[in-house]
């Protein structure tokens, strides 16, 4: 293995060491993914579509579940899978950039991805982005090497980790045709790559009664977020924000320095049709589609996690712009890129406020707002095995990581966010503990007492953003 590649991998591993040990599962729906995988691991079987895997790709859940069975620890299993995917992603991006733009471009692309705060977070939690990116880049490298069938298999697998992988099937087909001018091979590639998606659509039609059930769920969620943005900022401002969202997000995901250099290099390569220009098209055509939906149709709200492919492929072209800088400026640029993950971590770790909540989704370490972890620890330390715990839902979804971090068995929870079986669980068990969180639906977490359907709870421990209540002692008056 070449020394520059080893250096890039060493940087990547070092940057992920602390987050993988000290971070928390939160963004990328990591807690839910791990819980679903853990259920599957108890009884491995063919997923029954949306009824069991919800909106998540079944391959990612299966891989986590298999590692849970092998290792016995759900968090270790999920993080080991993500770390492997993260390091493979750095290695594969190096190989893609080396093939298209040379050794220097390969080194800087790999180093930039190693410093990417979002990629660090995805490599150190149970989220799916690092695994997806590794499969995507593996498929791309094989396609560039004209190993069409293997490339199609990997891209098909990527689409079963994250459904946005399906968008790249026709784009890869077009890429192969542009490079090889062999229509039959391009069509064969698309057929093989699309087969897993078609099978999964059939599974959903068979068991859920709707082939597109997972996609409809995702569309509903993003349409709701888009409406919330329009209501909050106004239609015009929301459209303008969505119009520039993708390039601005890339400048955060890839660090501001390398993100900007990658964008400049990508524009130059596309305008001059330099080697690799077609990779720019593969990276940015999906971005154009999502931008159209967000800015024109107002039915989609983009997230930084969606930009990881565009950011990674743009880094292939960062070296050209970096090479134009004088040596002191280059050193300063690299130092700024290395400092970006640390700065984002300091903005949100154990902090509250608007800046902390802005930084948290893209920071290198998975973090929770202060008080949520403490509340989870209190519940874990004080809940008895016969306690039934009522857990409030939250518009910030803080109930999900709180329950996950506590490690309390699922059967003890009565979670208001679980609309499907909330009433059934209440009918079976009377809650003896309750946890209210900020912006919850059941009650005000700042109050000393909490009345739920005639059951009176008294505050046992208060935290920032959450309060734990226990059933009031007999004879307690309101």
For each feature predicted by the language model, list its residue ranges:
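Transmembrane alpha-helix segments characteristic
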Residues: 7-13, 113, 155, 190-194, ...
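Short periplasmic/luminal acceptor-recognition loop of GT-C membrane glycosyltransferases, typified by
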Residues: 369, 373, 377-415, 434-439
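Membrane-lumen/periplasm interface segments of specific transmembrane helices
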Residues: 15, 185-262, 287-290, 343-350
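Hydrophobic/aromatic-rich transmembrane helices and adjacent perimembrane loops
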Residues: 122-123, 129, 158-161, 167, ...
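Signature aromatic-anchored transmembrane alpha helix within multi-pass, membrane-resident enzymes
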Residues: 5-10, 153, 170, 190-194, ...
């Amino acid at each position: 293995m070449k020394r520059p590649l080893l250096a890039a991998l060493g940087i990547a591993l070092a940057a992920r060491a602390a987050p993988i040990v000290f971070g928390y599962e939160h963004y990328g729906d990591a807690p839910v993914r791990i819980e679903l995988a853990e259920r599957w691991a108890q009884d491995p079987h063919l997923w029954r579509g949306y009824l069991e895997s919800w909106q998540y790709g079944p391959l990612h859940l299966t891989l986590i579940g298999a590692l849970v069975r092998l290792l016995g620890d759900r968090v270790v299993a999920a993080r080991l899978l993500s770390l492997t995917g993260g390091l493979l992603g750095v290695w594969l991006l190096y190989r893609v950039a080396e093939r298209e733009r040379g050794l220097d471009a390969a080194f800087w692309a790999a180093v930039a991805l190693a410093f990417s705060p979002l990629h660090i977070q995805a490599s150190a939690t149970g989220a799916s982005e690092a695994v997806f990116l590794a499969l995507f880049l593996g498929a791309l490298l094989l396609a560039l090497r004209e190993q069409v069938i293997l490339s199609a298999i990997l891209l098909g697998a990527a689409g079963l980790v994250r459904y946005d992988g399906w968008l790249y099937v026709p784009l890869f087909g077009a890429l192969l045709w542009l490079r090889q001018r062999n229509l039959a091979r391009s069509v064969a590639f698309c057929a093989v790559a699309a087969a897993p998606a078609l099978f999964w659509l059939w599974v959903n039609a068979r068991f859920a009664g709707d082939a597109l059930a997972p996609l409809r769920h995702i569309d509903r969620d993003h349409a709701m977020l888009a409406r919330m943005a329009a209501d909050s900022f106004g239609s015009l401002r929301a459209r303008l924000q969505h119009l520039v969202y993708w390039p601005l997000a890339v400048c955060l995901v890839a660090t501001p320095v390398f993100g900007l250099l990658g964008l400049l290099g990508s524009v130059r390569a596309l305008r001059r049709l330099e080697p690799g220009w077609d990779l720019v098209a593969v990276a940015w055509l999906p971005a154009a589609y999502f931008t159209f939906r967000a800015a024109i149709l107002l039915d989609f709200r983009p997230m930084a996690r969606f930009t990881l492919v565009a950011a990674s492929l743009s880094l292939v072209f960062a070296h050209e712009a970096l090479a134009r800088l004088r040596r002191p400026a280059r050193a300063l640029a690299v130092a700024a890129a290395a400092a970006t993950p640390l700065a984002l971590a300091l903005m949100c770790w154990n902090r509250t406020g608007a800046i902390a909540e802005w930084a948290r989704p893209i920071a290198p370490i998975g973090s929770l707002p202060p008080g949520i972890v403490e509340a989870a620890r209190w519940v874990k330390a004080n809940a008895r095995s016969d306690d039934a715990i009522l857990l409030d839902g939250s518009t910030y979804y803080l109930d999900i990581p709180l329950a996950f971090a506590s490690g309390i068995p699922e059967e003890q929870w009565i979670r208001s966010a679980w609309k499907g079986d909330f009433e059934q669980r209440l009918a079976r068990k009377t809650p003896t503990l309750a946890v209210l969180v900020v912006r919850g639906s059941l009650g005000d977490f700042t109050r000393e007492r909490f009345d739920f359907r005639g059951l009176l709870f008294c505050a046992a421990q208060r935290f920032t953003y959450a309060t734990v209540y226990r059933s009031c002692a007999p004879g307690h008056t309101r």
